Amino acid sequence: MLNLLILILFIVFSSPIVAAEIFVSNTEKNCPEWSQDKLQRETNSLMQQMAHWDQLYRQKGISEIDDEVYDQLMSELTHWQFCLKQAPHSDFPVEVFPDNKLVHPVAHTGLSKLKDKQEINRWLHGRLPVWLQPKIDGVAVTLVYQNGKLVSLISRGNGAEGVNWTAKSRYIPDIPQNIENAPPDLVLQGELFLHKEEHRQQLLGSDGARNRVAGLMMRKDHSSELKQIGLFIWSWPDGPAEMESKLRKLADMGFPLALRYSHKIEEPEQVQKLRMHYFEQPMLFATDGIVLKQEIEPKGNQWRSGSNSWAVAWKHPLRHQVTQVREVNFTIGRTGKISVVLGLDKVKLDDRQISRVNIGSVRRWRQLDVLPGDRVTLTLAGHGIPKLAQVVWRIKERQDIQPPDKQHYHALSCLTLTVGCEQQFNARLKWLGENLQMTGVSSGSWAMLTERKLVTDLTGWLALSAQQIAALPGIGDKRAQAIYSQFSKAKNQPFSYWMKGIGVPYMDKLSDNVYHWQQLEQKLAAAQLKQQLTVGQLKKLSDFVSDAQIKAIAEKLSVAGITGFDRENGVVVNPADMAQ
Protein backbone atom coordinates (compact mmCIF):
# COMPACT_ATOMS: atom_id res chain seq x y z
CA MET A 1 0.00 0.00 0.00
CA LEU A 2 2.87 2.37 0.78
CA ASN A 3 4.32 1.77 -2.69
CA LEU A 4 0.93 2.63 -4.13
CA LEU A 5 0.93 5.92 -2.22
CA ILE A 6 4.37 6.71 -3.58
CA LEU A 7 3.14 6.13 -7.12
CA ILE A 8 0.11 8.33 -6.56
CA LEU A 9 2.36 11.05 -5.17
CA PHE A 10 4.31 10.78 -8.38
CA ILE A 11 1.32 10.86 -10.71
CA VAL A 12 -1.52 12.73 -9.07
CA PHE A 13 0.83 15.54 -8.14
CA SER A 14 1.68 15.87 -11.80
CA SER A 15 -0.18 19.19 -11.91
CA PRO A 16 2.35 21.76 -13.19
CA ILE A 17 1.70 23.99 -10.20
CA VAL A 18 2.63 21.57 -7.46
CA ALA A 19 6.40 21.84 -7.36
CA ALA A 20 6.33 25.58 -6.83
CA GLU A 21 3.51 25.32 -4.30
CA ILE A 22 5.26 22.76 -2.13
CA PHE A 23 8.45 24.78 -1.86
CA VAL A 24 6.60 27.97 -0.94
CA SER A 25 4.29 26.31 1.58
CA ASN A 26 7.11 24.46 3.32
CA THR A 27 9.28 27.53 3.72
CA GLU A 28 6.43 29.77 4.89
CA LYS A 29 4.72 27.44 7.39
CA ASN A 30 5.92 26.68 10.90
CA CYS A 31 6.58 23.09 11.89
CA PRO A 32 4.22 21.49 14.43
CA GLU A 33 5.10 22.04 18.08
CA TRP A 34 5.58 18.31 18.65
CA SER A 35 8.48 16.13 19.57
CA GLN A 36 10.25 14.49 16.64
CA ASP A 37 8.87 11.10 17.70
CA LYS A 38 5.30 12.36 17.74
CA LEU A 39 5.75 14.15 14.42
CA GLN A 40 7.04 10.93 12.88
CA ARG A 41 4.08 8.95 14.26
CA GLU A 42 1.55 11.47 12.99
CA THR A 43 3.29 11.64 9.61
CA ASN A 44 3.10 7.86 9.29
CA SER A 45 -0.56 7.95 10.29
CA LEU A 46 -1.41 10.56 7.65
CA MET A 47 0.53 8.60 5.02
CA GLN A 48 -1.51 5.50 5.83
CA GLN A 49 -4.75 7.45 5.46
CA MET A 50 -3.64 8.84 2.10
CA ALA A 51 -2.69 5.34 1.01
CA HIS A 52 -6.17 4.10 1.94
CA TRP A 53 -7.82 6.73 -0.24
CA ASP A 54 -5.45 5.97 -3.10
CA GLN A 55 -6.18 2.26 -2.85
CA LEU A 56 -9.90 2.93 -3.21
CA TYR A 57 -9.27 5.17 -6.22
CA ARG A 58 -7.06 2.64 -7.96
CA GLN A 59 -9.01 -0.55 -7.31
CA LYS A 60 -12.64 0.61 -7.17
CA GLY A 61 -12.76 4.17 -8.45
CA ILE A 62 -14.33 5.26 -5.15
CA SER A 63 -13.74 8.89 -4.15
CA GLU A 64 -13.98 9.38 -0.40
CA ILE A 65 -12.43 12.84 -0.49
CA ASP A 66 -12.56 15.81 -2.83
CA ASP A 67 -9.48 16.53 -4.93
CA GLU A 68 -8.93 19.99 -3.44
CA VAL A 69 -9.06 18.50 0.07
CA TYR A 70 -6.68 15.73 -0.98
CA ASP A 71 -4.26 18.35 -2.30
CA GLN A 72 -4.33 20.34 0.94
CA LEU A 73 -3.67 17.23 3.03
CA MET A 74 -0.90 16.16 0.69
CA SER A 75 0.65 19.58 1.12
CA GLU A 76 0.43 19.09 4.89
CA LEU A 77 2.08 15.68 4.62
CA THR A 78 4.87 17.08 2.46
CA HIS A 79 5.39 19.89 4.96
CA TRP A 80 5.73 17.43 7.83
CA GLN A 81 8.27 15.45 5.82
CA PHE A 82 10.13 18.70 5.25
CA CYS A 83 10.12 19.30 9.02
CA LEU A 84 11.49 15.78 9.54
CA LYS A 85 14.20 16.47 6.94
CA GLN A 86 13.00 13.49 4.94
CA ALA A 87 13.70 13.01 1.24
CA PRO A 88 11.22 14.54 -1.20
CA HIS A 89 8.65 12.08 -2.49
CA SER A 90 9.48 12.88 -6.12
CA ASP A 91 12.55 10.59 -5.97
CA PHE A 92 10.60 7.54 -4.84
CA PRO A 93 9.00 6.35 -8.10
CA VAL A 94 12.32 5.91 -9.89
CA GLU A 95 13.40 3.47 -7.19
CA VAL A 96 10.10 1.62 -7.15
CA PHE A 97 9.39 1.44 -10.90
CA PRO A 98 12.79 1.63 -12.64
CA ASP A 99 11.64 -0.33 -15.70
CA ASN A 100 8.57 1.78 -16.46
CA LYS A 101 9.93 5.30 -16.68
CA LEU A 102 10.74 7.62 -19.54
CA VAL A 103 12.64 10.89 -19.68
CA HIS A 104 10.72 13.96 -20.84
CA PRO A 105 12.26 15.48 -24.00
CA VAL A 106 11.26 18.87 -22.57
CA ALA A 107 10.94 19.32 -18.81
CA HIS A 108 7.62 20.14 -17.16
CA THR A 109 8.36 23.45 -15.49
CA GLY A 110 5.50 23.82 -13.04
CA LEU A 111 3.77 27.12 -12.35
CA SER A 112 3.98 29.75 -9.67
CA LYS A 113 0.63 30.26 -7.92
CA LEU A 114 -0.52 33.83 -7.44
CA LYS A 115 -2.89 34.45 -4.56
CA ASP A 116 -5.08 37.39 -5.49
CA LYS A 117 -6.00 40.09 -7.97
CA GLN A 118 -3.23 42.39 -6.76
CA GLU A 119 -0.52 39.79 -7.46
CA ILE A 120 -2.09 39.06 -10.85
CA ASN A 121 -2.08 42.74 -11.79
CA ARG A 122 1.57 43.08 -10.78
CA TRP A 123 2.49 40.11 -12.96
CA LEU A 124 0.50 41.49 -15.88
CA HIS A 125 2.22 44.88 -15.68
CA GLY A 126 4.49 45.22 -18.70
CA ARG A 127 3.46 41.83 -20.11
CA LEU A 128 0.12 42.55 -21.80
CA PRO A 129 -1.19 41.17 -24.03
CA VAL A 130 -1.05 37.63 -22.62
CA TRP A 131 -3.14 34.49 -23.05
CA LEU A 132 -5.50 32.84 -20.59
CA GLN A 133 -6.53 29.19 -20.47
CA PRO A 134 -8.51 27.18 -17.93
CA LYS A 135 -6.33 25.20 -15.55
CA ILE A 136 -7.74 21.76 -16.24
CA ASP A 137 -7.89 19.56 -13.16
CA GLY A 138 -6.42 16.35 -14.47
CA VAL A 139 -3.11 14.54 -14.92
CA ALA A 140 -0.27 16.24 -16.80
CA VAL A 141 1.49 14.32 -19.58
CA THR A 142 3.99 14.63 -22.41
CA LEU A 143 3.16 13.35 -25.90
CA VAL A 144 6.04 12.61 -28.27
CA TYR A 145 5.41 12.18 -32.02
CA GLN A 146 8.03 11.18 -34.57
CA ASN A 147 7.12 11.60 -38.23
CA GLY A 148 3.49 11.93 -37.21
CA LYS A 149 3.34 8.74 -35.12
CA LEU A 150 2.82 8.74 -31.36
CA VAL A 151 5.82 7.05 -29.79
CA SER A 152 5.49 8.07 -26.13
CA LEU A 153 2.88 9.14 -23.61
CA ILE A 154 4.61 10.03 -20.32
CA SER A 155 3.13 11.10 -16.98
CA ARG A 156 4.59 14.30 -15.57
CA GLY A 157 6.23 12.55 -12.64
CA ASN A 158 8.95 14.74 -11.16
CA GLY A 159 9.06 16.99 -14.20
CA ALA A 160 12.20 15.39 -15.64
CA GLU A 161 10.91 11.83 -16.03
CA GLY A 162 7.64 10.01 -15.58
CA VAL A 163 5.71 6.77 -16.03
CA ASN A 164 5.39 5.28 -19.51
CA TRP A 165 1.69 5.27 -20.40
CA THR A 166 2.08 4.79 -24.14
CA ALA A 167 0.19 1.48 -24.21
CA LYS A 168 -2.85 3.12 -22.64
CA SER A 169 -3.01 5.84 -25.30
CA ARG A 170 -4.54 3.48 -27.89
CA TYR A 171 -7.70 3.25 -25.79
CA ILE A 172 -8.18 7.01 -25.48
CA PRO A 173 -9.94 8.34 -28.61
CA ASP A 174 -8.90 11.95 -27.93
CA ILE A 175 -5.22 11.04 -28.39
CA PRO A 176 -4.35 10.80 -32.12
CA GLN A 177 -2.09 7.86 -32.83
CA ASN A 178 -1.03 9.31 -36.17
CA ILE A 179 -0.98 12.90 -37.42
CA GLU A 180 -0.62 13.47 -41.16
CA ASN A 181 0.51 17.09 -41.06
CA ALA A 182 2.75 16.97 -37.99
CA PRO A 183 6.37 18.20 -37.98
CA PRO A 184 9.00 15.41 -37.92
CA ASP A 185 9.68 15.85 -34.20
CA LEU A 186 6.73 17.01 -32.13
CA VAL A 187 6.63 17.33 -28.34
CA LEU A 188 3.41 18.43 -26.65
CA GLN A 189 2.47 18.89 -23.01
CA GLY A 190 -1.10 18.71 -21.83
CA GLU A 191 -3.67 17.41 -19.38
CA LEU A 192 -5.59 14.16 -19.36
CA PHE A 193 -9.01 14.92 -17.92
CA LEU A 194 -12.31 13.19 -17.28
CA HIS A 195 -15.07 14.20 -19.70
CA LYS A 196 -17.97 15.84 -17.87
CA GLU A 197 -21.37 17.15 -18.86
CA GLU A 198 -22.52 20.55 -17.62
CA HIS A 199 -19.90 20.48 -14.87
CA ARG A 200 -20.08 23.54 -12.61
CA GLN A 201 -16.93 23.83 -10.55
CA GLN A 202 -18.49 26.19 -8.02
CA LEU A 203 -21.19 23.66 -7.15
CA LEU A 204 -19.48 20.31 -7.66
CA GLY A 205 -15.78 20.92 -7.12
CA SER A 206 -13.52 18.55 -9.01
CA ASP A 207 -15.69 15.58 -8.02
CA GLY A 208 -12.69 13.24 -7.90
CA ALA A 209 -11.95 13.80 -11.58
CA ARG A 210 -8.17 13.97 -11.37
CA ASN A 211 -7.81 10.91 -9.18
CA ARG A 212 -10.25 9.01 -11.36
CA VAL A 213 -8.01 9.63 -14.36
CA ALA A 214 -4.92 8.62 -12.40
CA GLY A 215 -6.61 5.42 -11.27
CA LEU A 216 -7.62 4.48 -14.81
CA MET A 217 -4.13 5.15 -16.16
CA MET A 218 -2.46 3.07 -13.43
CA ARG A 219 -4.59 -0.04 -13.86
CA LYS A 220 -2.90 -3.00 -15.45
CA ASP A 221 -5.96 -3.72 -17.56
CA HIS A 222 -7.25 -1.45 -20.32
CA SER A 223 -10.61 -0.41 -18.94
CA SER A 224 -13.37 0.64 -21.32
CA GLU A 225 -13.64 3.75 -19.15
CA LEU A 226 -10.44 5.06 -20.74
CA LYS A 227 -12.61 6.41 -23.54
CA GLN A 228 -14.01 8.91 -21.01
CA ILE A 229 -10.60 10.58 -20.82
CA GLY A 230 -10.02 13.75 -22.81
CA LEU A 231 -6.85 15.66 -23.66
CA PHE A 232 -6.17 19.38 -23.43
CA ILE A 233 -2.86 20.53 -24.92
CA TRP A 234 -1.56 23.52 -23.03
CA SER A 235 2.02 23.71 -24.26
CA TRP A 236 3.89 23.17 -27.52
CA PRO A 237 7.59 23.73 -26.80
CA ASP A 238 9.42 25.09 -29.84
CA GLY A 239 6.13 25.41 -31.72
CA PRO A 240 5.00 28.44 -33.75
CA ALA A 241 6.00 31.72 -32.09
CA GLU A 242 2.58 33.34 -32.41
CA MET A 243 -0.09 31.88 -30.13
CA GLU A 244 -2.91 32.22 -32.67
CA SER A 245 -0.90 30.28 -35.23
CA LYS A 246 0.01 27.68 -32.61
CA LEU A 247 -3.63 27.18 -31.59
CA ARG A 248 -4.87 26.82 -35.17
CA LYS A 249 -2.11 24.33 -35.99
CA LEU A 250 -2.96 22.26 -32.88
CA ALA A 251 -6.60 22.15 -33.94
CA ASP A 252 -5.59 21.03 -37.45
CA MET A 253 -3.54 18.19 -35.93
CA GLY A 254 -6.49 16.90 -33.88
CA PHE A 255 -6.20 18.91 -30.66
CA PRO A 256 -9.09 21.41 -30.90
CA LEU A 257 -9.70 22.30 -27.25
CA ALA A 258 -6.84 24.77 -26.82
CA LEU A 259 -8.19 26.92 -29.67
CA ARG A 260 -11.68 26.85 -28.17
CA TYR A 261 -10.60 27.66 -24.62
CA SER A 262 -7.79 30.19 -25.08
CA HIS A 263 -8.41 33.90 -24.59
CA LYS A 264 -6.26 36.87 -25.50
CA ILE A 265 -6.00 39.21 -22.50
CA GLU A 266 -5.46 42.89 -23.21
CA GLU A 267 -6.95 44.37 -20.02
CA PRO A 268 -6.50 43.11 -16.41
CA GLU A 269 -10.27 43.21 -15.84
CA GLN A 270 -10.69 40.34 -18.31
CA VAL A 271 -8.78 37.97 -16.02
CA GLN A 272 -11.16 38.09 -13.05
CA LYS A 273 -14.18 37.87 -15.34
CA LEU A 274 -12.87 34.75 -17.10
CA ARG A 275 -11.72 33.17 -13.84
CA MET A 276 -15.26 33.40 -12.48
CA HIS A 277 -16.62 32.21 -15.84
CA TYR A 278 -14.68 28.96 -15.54
CA PHE A 279 -15.62 28.68 -11.87
CA GLU A 280 -19.36 29.24 -12.30
CA GLN A 281 -20.39 28.18 -15.81
CA PRO A 282 -21.00 24.61 -17.07
CA MET A 283 -17.93 22.99 -18.64
CA LEU A 284 -16.97 19.65 -20.12
CA PHE A 285 -14.13 19.26 -17.62
CA ALA A 286 -13.22 20.07 -14.04
CA THR A 287 -10.94 23.05 -13.49
CA ASP A 288 -9.05 24.33 -10.48
CA GLY A 289 -8.19 27.79 -11.74
CA ILE A 290 -6.84 29.67 -14.73
CA VAL A 291 -3.38 29.94 -16.30
CA LEU A 292 -1.85 33.11 -17.74
CA LYS A 293 1.03 32.82 -20.18
CA GLN A 294 3.15 35.14 -22.26
CA GLU A 295 3.13 34.66 -26.00
CA ILE A 296 6.90 34.43 -26.24
CA GLU A 297 8.45 31.41 -24.49
CA PRO A 298 12.07 30.27 -24.13
CA LYS A 299 13.38 27.44 -26.26
CA GLY A 300 12.41 24.00 -24.99
CA ASN A 301 15.99 23.07 -24.07
CA GLN A 302 15.96 25.92 -21.55
CA TRP A 303 12.91 24.67 -19.65
CA ARG A 304 13.65 23.43 -16.14
CA SER A 305 11.42 21.77 -13.57
CA GLY A 306 10.34 24.30 -10.93
CA SER A 307 11.41 27.30 -13.02
CA ASN A 308 8.88 29.20 -15.12
CA SER A 309 8.70 32.99 -15.40
CA TRP A 310 6.50 33.17 -18.50
CA ALA A 311 3.35 31.58 -17.05
CA VAL A 312 1.47 31.68 -13.74
CA ALA A 313 -1.68 30.17 -12.24
CA TRP A 314 -4.52 31.67 -10.22
CA LYS A 315 -6.56 28.99 -8.52
CA HIS A 316 -10.31 29.05 -8.00
CA PRO A 317 -11.73 30.03 -4.61
CA LEU A 318 -11.63 26.96 -2.39
CA ARG A 319 -14.99 25.30 -1.79
CA HIS A 320 -13.57 23.31 1.11
CA GLN A 321 -10.81 24.74 3.25
CA VAL A 322 -8.77 22.34 5.39
CA THR A 323 -7.66 23.59 8.78
CA GLN A 324 -6.45 22.26 12.11
CA VAL A 325 -8.59 22.11 15.23
CA ARG A 326 -6.78 23.97 18.00
CA GLU A 327 -9.25 23.60 20.86
CA VAL A 328 -12.70 22.36 21.78
CA ASN A 329 -14.80 24.89 23.69
CA PHE A 330 -18.16 24.31 25.33
CA THR A 331 -20.61 27.21 25.49
CA ILE A 332 -23.67 27.24 27.72
CA GLY A 333 -26.65 29.29 26.56
CA ARG A 334 -29.29 30.99 28.66
CA THR A 335 -31.59 27.93 28.64
CA GLY A 336 -28.76 25.61 29.68
CA LYS A 337 -28.18 24.19 26.23
CA ILE A 338 -24.54 23.18 25.77
CA SER A 339 -23.00 23.85 22.36
CA VAL A 340 -19.57 22.96 21.04
CA VAL A 341 -17.38 25.55 19.32
CA LEU A 342 -14.10 24.52 17.71
CA GLY A 343 -11.15 26.91 17.83
CA LEU A 344 -9.25 26.62 14.54
CA ASP A 345 -6.07 27.67 12.82
CA LYS A 346 -7.19 30.82 11.03
CA VAL A 347 -8.06 30.26 7.38
CA LYS A 348 -9.49 32.40 4.59
CA LEU A 349 -12.68 31.27 2.91
CA ASP A 350 -14.42 33.49 0.36
CA ASP A 351 -12.54 36.57 1.62
CA ARG A 352 -13.49 35.81 5.25
CA GLN A 353 -11.02 35.01 8.02
CA ILE A 354 -12.37 32.08 10.03
CA SER A 355 -10.92 30.91 13.35
CA ARG A 356 -13.91 29.18 14.99
CA VAL A 357 -16.95 27.16 14.02
CA ASN A 358 -20.02 26.09 15.98
CA ILE A 359 -20.75 22.40 15.43
CA GLY A 360 -23.89 22.17 17.56
CA SER A 361 -24.64 19.81 20.41
CA VAL A 362 -22.36 17.65 22.54
CA ARG A 363 -24.03 14.63 20.97
CA ARG A 364 -22.99 15.72 17.49
CA TRP A 365 -19.47 16.48 18.74
CA ARG A 366 -19.22 12.92 20.05
CA GLN A 367 -20.50 11.56 16.72
CA LEU A 368 -17.93 13.60 14.81
CA ASP A 369 -15.16 12.50 17.20
CA VAL A 370 -13.23 15.71 16.60
CA LEU A 371 -10.38 16.76 18.91
CA PRO A 372 -7.43 19.17 18.89
CA GLY A 373 -4.96 18.28 16.15
CA ASP A 374 -7.59 16.86 13.80
CA ARG A 375 -7.99 18.27 10.29
CA VAL A 376 -11.45 19.42 9.26
CA THR A 377 -12.94 21.01 6.16
CA LEU A 378 -14.98 24.19 6.26
CA THR A 379 -17.56 25.57 3.87
CA LEU A 380 -19.78 28.62 3.98
CA ALA A 381 -23.47 27.99 4.57
CA GLY A 382 -26.26 30.53 4.13
CA HIS A 383 -25.45 34.15 4.95
CA GLY A 384 -21.74 33.32 4.93
CA ILE A 385 -21.84 31.34 8.17
CA PRO A 386 -18.90 28.91 8.44
CA LYS A 387 -19.90 25.26 8.61
CA LEU A 388 -17.88 22.16 9.41
CA ALA A 389 -18.24 19.89 6.41
CA GLN A 390 -16.13 16.89 7.40
CA VAL A 391 -13.43 15.58 9.70
CA VAL A 392 -10.92 14.51 7.05
CA TRP A 393 -8.12 13.24 9.27
CA ARG A 394 -7.85 12.45 12.97
CA ILE A 395 -4.65 12.83 14.90
CA LYS A 396 -3.33 9.53 16.20
CA GLU A 397 -2.76 10.63 19.81
CA ARG A 398 -6.22 11.56 21.15
CA GLN A 399 -6.89 13.85 24.11
CA ASP A 400 -9.46 13.01 26.78
CA ILE A 401 -11.84 15.98 26.84
CA GLN A 402 -14.98 15.90 28.96
CA PRO A 403 -17.93 18.26 28.37
CA PRO A 404 -19.82 20.01 31.20
CA ASP A 405 -22.36 17.84 33.03
CA LYS A 406 -25.67 18.51 31.28
CA GLN A 407 -27.55 17.68 34.49
CA HIS A 408 -26.27 20.93 35.98
CA TYR A 409 -27.71 23.18 33.26
CA HIS A 410 -31.36 23.66 32.37
CA ALA A 411 -34.10 26.29 32.05
CA LEU A 412 -33.96 27.16 35.76
CA SER A 413 -30.24 26.87 36.43
CA CYS A 414 -27.82 29.77 36.86
CA LEU A 415 -30.38 32.45 37.63
CA THR A 416 -27.73 33.90 39.91
CA LEU A 417 -23.97 34.18 39.52
CA THR A 418 -22.34 31.15 41.13
CA VAL A 419 -19.27 29.05 40.38
CA GLY A 420 -19.69 27.27 37.03
CA CYS A 421 -22.60 29.51 36.06
CA GLU A 422 -20.70 32.36 34.45
CA GLN A 423 -21.57 31.49 30.85
CA GLN A 424 -25.26 30.77 31.32
CA PHE A 425 -25.79 33.72 33.66
CA ASN A 426 -24.13 36.15 31.25
CA ALA A 427 -26.24 34.70 28.43
CA ARG A 428 -29.35 35.39 30.52
CA LEU A 429 -28.28 39.02 31.05
CA LYS A 430 -27.59 39.47 27.33
CA TRP A 431 -31.04 38.08 26.48
CA LEU A 432 -32.68 40.31 29.08
CA GLY A 433 -30.93 43.40 27.74
CA GLU A 434 -31.91 42.62 24.17
CA ASN A 435 -35.57 42.11 25.07
CA LEU A 436 -35.59 45.36 27.05
CA GLN A 437 -34.22 47.01 23.89
CA MET A 438 -30.99 48.21 25.45
CA THR A 439 -28.56 49.55 22.86
CA GLY A 440 -24.83 49.70 23.37
CA VAL A 441 -24.89 47.20 26.23
CA SER A 442 -22.93 44.31 24.77
CA SER A 443 -22.00 40.86 26.01
CA GLY A 444 -18.66 42.36 27.01
CA SER A 445 -20.41 45.01 29.09
CA TRP A 446 -22.35 42.39 31.04
CA ALA A 447 -19.21 40.29 31.46
CA MET A 448 -17.34 43.20 33.05
CA LEU A 449 -20.23 43.81 35.45
CA THR A 450 -20.36 40.17 36.52
CA GLU A 451 -16.58 39.76 36.76
CA ARG A 452 -16.52 42.61 39.28
CA LYS A 453 -19.55 41.13 41.08
CA LEU A 454 -21.54 44.32 40.51
CA VAL A 455 -24.32 42.17 39.07
CA THR A 456 -24.94 38.77 40.66
CA ASP A 457 -28.62 38.25 39.84
CA LEU A 458 -30.91 39.27 36.98
CA THR A 459 -32.07 42.44 38.77
CA GLY A 460 -28.77 43.59 40.28
CA TRP A 461 -28.09 46.17 37.57
CA LEU A 462 -31.27 48.10 38.50
CA ALA A 463 -29.56 49.55 41.59
CA LEU A 464 -26.27 50.53 39.94
CA SER A 465 -25.21 54.15 39.71
CA ALA A 466 -23.30 55.75 36.85
CA GLN A 467 -20.33 56.16 39.22
CA GLN A 468 -20.22 52.42 39.97
CA ILE A 469 -20.25 51.61 36.27
CA ALA A 470 -17.55 54.21 35.53
CA ALA A 471 -15.27 52.54 38.09
CA LEU A 472 -14.93 49.51 35.82
CA PRO A 473 -11.55 49.30 33.99
CA GLY A 474 -11.68 50.86 30.54
CA ILE A 475 -15.25 52.12 30.77
CA GLY A 476 -14.86 55.86 31.34
CA ASP A 477 -17.49 58.41 32.30
CA LYS A 478 -19.06 58.82 28.86
CA ARG A 479 -19.65 55.14 28.23
CA ALA A 480 -20.75 54.60 31.84
CA GLN A 481 -23.36 57.31 31.45
CA ALA A 482 -24.58 55.71 28.22
CA ILE A 483 -24.97 52.31 29.90
CA TYR A 484 -26.66 53.87 32.93
CA SER A 485 -29.07 55.67 30.61
CA GLN A 486 -30.03 52.36 28.97
CA PHE A 487 -30.58 50.78 32.39
CA SER A 488 -32.84 53.66 33.40
CA LYS A 489 -34.89 53.48 30.20
CA ALA A 490 -35.30 49.71 30.60
CA LYS A 491 -37.18 50.20 33.87
CA ASN A 492 -40.09 51.69 31.92
CA GLN A 493 -40.38 48.98 29.27
CA PRO A 494 -43.71 47.11 28.93
CA PHE A 495 -44.48 44.12 31.13
CA SER A 496 -44.36 41.73 28.16
CA TYR A 497 -40.75 42.77 27.42
CA TRP A 498 -39.74 41.99 30.99
CA MET A 499 -41.53 38.65 31.00
CA LYS A 500 -39.79 37.50 27.85
CA GLY A 501 -36.50 38.93 29.08
CA ILE A 502 -36.43 36.95 32.33
CA GLY A 503 -37.25 33.83 30.33
CA VAL A 504 -40.95 33.17 31.00
CA PRO A 505 -41.93 30.53 28.40
CA TYR A 506 -44.57 31.11 25.70
CA MET A 507 -45.04 34.82 26.31
CA ASP A 508 -45.61 35.27 22.57
CA LYS A 509 -48.85 33.31 23.01
CA LEU A 510 -49.89 35.00 26.25
CA SER A 511 -48.97 38.67 25.87
CA ASP A 512 -52.53 39.66 24.83
CA ASN A 513 -54.07 37.93 27.86
CA VAL A 514 -51.52 38.51 30.62
CA TYR A 515 -50.45 41.98 31.74
CA HIS A 516 -49.50 41.45 35.39
CA TRP A 517 -47.43 38.87 37.29
CA GLN A 518 -50.15 38.20 39.86
CA GLN A 519 -52.66 37.73 37.06
CA LEU A 520 -50.45 35.06 35.48
CA GLU A 521 -50.11 33.25 38.82
CA GLN A 522 -53.88 33.34 39.32
CA LYS A 523 -54.66 32.10 35.82
CA LEU A 524 -52.25 29.21 36.25
CA ALA A 525 -53.79 28.34 39.61
CA ALA A 526 -57.27 28.39 38.08
CA ALA A 527 -56.21 26.41 34.99
CA GLN A 528 -57.45 29.19 32.71
CA LEU A 529 -54.77 28.98 29.99
CA LYS A 530 -55.79 25.68 28.42
CA GLN A 531 -57.01 27.32 25.24
CA GLN A 532 -53.66 28.97 24.58
CA LEU A 533 -51.24 26.23 25.66
CA THR A 534 -50.91 22.46 25.49
CA VAL A 535 -50.68 20.32 28.61
CA GLY A 536 -46.92 20.07 28.26
CA GLN A 537 -46.53 23.81 27.71
CA LEU A 538 -48.71 24.55 30.74
CA LYS A 539 -46.53 22.35 32.93
CA LYS A 540 -43.35 24.01 31.69
CA LEU A 541 -44.83 27.46 32.33
CA SER A 542 -46.14 26.48 35.76
CA ASP A 543 -42.81 24.97 36.80
CA PHE A 544 -41.04 28.16 35.76
CA VAL A 545 -43.42 30.61 37.46
CA SER A 546 -43.62 28.60 40.69
CA ASP A 547 -39.85 28.23 41.03
CA ALA A 548 -38.55 29.93 44.18
CA GLN A 549 -35.78 31.73 42.28
CA ILE A 550 -38.25 33.16 39.77
CA LYS A 551 -40.58 34.26 42.56
CA ALA A 552 -37.64 36.05 44.16
CA ILE A 553 -36.90 37.85 40.88
CA ALA A 554 -40.55 38.90 40.57
CA GLU A 555 -40.47 40.22 44.13
CA LYS A 556 -37.33 42.28 43.45
CA LEU A 557 -38.94 43.73 40.32
CA SER A 558 -41.97 44.59 42.41
CA VAL A 559 -39.80 46.42 44.93
CA ALA A 560 -38.10 48.26 42.05
CA GLY A 561 -41.49 49.46 40.82
CA ILE A 562 -41.40 47.70 37.47
CA THR A 563 -44.76 47.87 35.69
CA GLY A 564 -46.70 44.61 35.99
CA PHE A 565 -44.82 43.38 39.04
CA ASP A 566 -45.83 46.06 41.54
CA ARG A 567 -47.98 44.44 44.21
CA GLU A 568 -49.34 47.70 45.59
CA ASN A 569 -51.19 48.20 42.33
CA GLY A 570 -51.85 44.54 41.78
CA VAL A 571 -55.10 43.61 40.13
CA VAL A 572 -57.93 41.54 41.44
CA VAL A 573 -58.84 39.19 38.68
CA ASN A 574 -62.53 38.41 38.32
CA PRO A 575 -63.73 35.10 36.91
CA ALA A 576 -64.88 36.64 33.63
CA ASP A 577 -61.42 38.10 33.02
CA MET A 578 -59.74 34.82 33.93
CA ALA A 579 -61.86 32.98 31.39
CA GLN A 580 -60.64 35.07 28.49
Swiss-Prot record:
Catalyses which reaction(s): NAD(+) + (deoxyribonucleotide)n-3'-hydroxyl + 5'-phospho-(deoxyribonucleotide)m = (deoxyribonucleotide)n+m + AMP + beta-nicotinamide D-nucleotide
InterPro entries per record: DNA_ligase_B, DNAligase_adenylation, DNAligase_N, NA-bd_OB-fold, NAD_dep_DNA_ligaseB, NAD_DNA_ligase_OB, RuvA_2-like
TM stretches of this protein: none
Entry keyword Heme: no
GO biological process: DNA repair; DNA replication
EC top class, as a word: ligase
UniProt cross-references to Pfam families, sorted A to Z: DNA_ligase_aden, DNA_ligase_OB
EC number annotated for this UniProt entry: 6.5.1.2
This protein's UniProt keywords: DNA damage, DNA repair, DNA replication, Ligase, NAD
Family as reported in the entry's similarity comment: Belongs to the NAD-dependent DNA ligase family. LigB subfamily.
Protein name: DNA ligase B
Originating organism: Photorhabdus laumondii subsp. laumondii (strain DSM 15139 / CIP 105565 / TT01) (Photorhabdus luminescens subsp. laumondii)
Gene: ligB
